């Protein structure tokens, strides 16, 4: 229906919605149908490398079905006739990627993309030991945070949360920051 009414697209964009897609095969099948030759799909996603490096476990929550790194995403895309050809690093959400994709061989891979692939390989994000170490750091962070907040409460001071986004709920629930620690939260 979209093709019939509007024709093929030169550019399709999606910022911070990709992690919510529950059927990537169907999504990319339709993107390929909608993109004209030399068309570009641009998505912006929180970057898993930064999540691990900066201990951003609060960005993990029920609505996010995927966390993106370039190596497996590009491998998947190549199997379905697409590729990543460029990438930009963004500061939003603790560090995000704007990823530029096309049908295979429509565009030459940029130096930025190649450098980030090398950085991902060096980071060994697919190594289970790296992920276990991350989990251990998360547990340690929870203990440290609850200790600091408990000490603040013991001194008779208030602990409040300003704003309560989904990410905040992950932190509050995982760290068990309930009414005994938090005086109130406000949006």
Residue ranges of predicted features:
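Short amphipathic alpha-helix with an adjacent loop that forms part of the alpha/beta core around
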Residues: 1-8
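Hydrophobic adenine-recognition pocket in adenosine-nucleotide-binding enzymes
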Residues: 17
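Conserved S-adenosyl-L-methionine
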Residues: 82-93
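A conserved beta-strand element that flanks and buttresses the S-adenosyl-L-methionine
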Residues: 10-14
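A solvent-exposed beta-alpha-beta segment
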Residues: 2, 150-187
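Short, glycine-/aromatic-enriched active-site segment of Class I SAM-dependent methyltransferases
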Residues: 43-66, 70-73, 77
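Flexible, glycine-/basic-rich loop-and-beta segments that form/coincide
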Residues: 93-141
């Amino acid at each position: 229906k979209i093709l019939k009414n509007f024709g093929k697209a030169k550019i399709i964009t999606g910022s911070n919605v990709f992690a919510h897609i529950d059927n990537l095969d169907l999504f990319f099948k339709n993107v390929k149908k909608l993109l004209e030759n030399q068309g570009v799909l641009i998505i912006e996603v929180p970057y898993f490398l930064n999540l691990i490096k900066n201990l951003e476990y609060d960005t993990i929550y029920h609505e996010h079905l995927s966390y993106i790194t370039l190596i497996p995403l590009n491998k998947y895309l190549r199997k379905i006739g697409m590729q990543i050809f460029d990438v930009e690093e963004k500061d939003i959400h603790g560090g995000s990627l704007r990823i530029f994709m096309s049908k295979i061989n429509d565009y030459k891979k940029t130096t930025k993309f190649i450098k980030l692939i090398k950085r991902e390989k060096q980071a060994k994000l697919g190594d289970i030991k790296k992920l276990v170490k991350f989990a251990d750091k998360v547990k340690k962070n929870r203990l440290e945070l609850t200790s600091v907040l408990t000490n603040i409460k013991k001194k008779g001071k208030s602990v409040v949360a300003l704003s309560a986004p989904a990410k905040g709920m992950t932190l509050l629930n995982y760290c068990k920051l309930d009414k005994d620690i938090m005086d109130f939260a406000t949006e």
